[in-house]
Amino acid sequence: MTKIYIDGDACPVKDEVFKVAGRYGLAVTVVGNAWLRLPQDPMITMIVVPEGPDAADDRIAELIEPGDICITNDIPLGSRCLIKRALVLRPNGKPMTENSIGDALATRDLMNTLREIGTMTGGPPPFAKADRSRFLSALDTMVHQAKRVVP
């Protein structure tokens, strides 16, 4: 059965995930390096990992299986999940796919290099109401896709 994993420390759409997961009866696991206040629901669990740059990512990549869904903005984690045949969705509602992940990794590496040499690159645009709406629609679609991967 499909499970949803949330890269939880900075995810702005946790409540939306809980709502969609509840509608479909899916288990949700939030992974982060600090306890978060979550709804009292037997289908929602929290895994707290030790502090470290990739501890939450490593745990999600270890647990995720084909047909599961990962909610993350982290491109390397998205790549690791795609390799395991999971589905990946960013909080802004844009999926990471096998076709898009290579470009996303290359852009990330380029931006890191530019920051290292002192070029100002700016950050992502602020999270907007339209992002939340797009996310809900995309997650609903992705749940149906996941059911086709693992019936």
Curated annotation (Swiss-Prot):
InterPro entries, A to Z: UPF0178
Pfam families, sorted: DUF188 (PF02639)
Superkingdom as given in the UniProt entry: Bacteria
Family: Belongs to the UPF0178 family.
PANTHER family: UPF0178 PROTEIN YAII
Name listed for the protein in its UniProt record: UPF0178 protein amb2838
Native species: Paramagnetospirillum magneticum (strain ATCC 700264 / AMB-1) (Magnetospirillum magneticum)
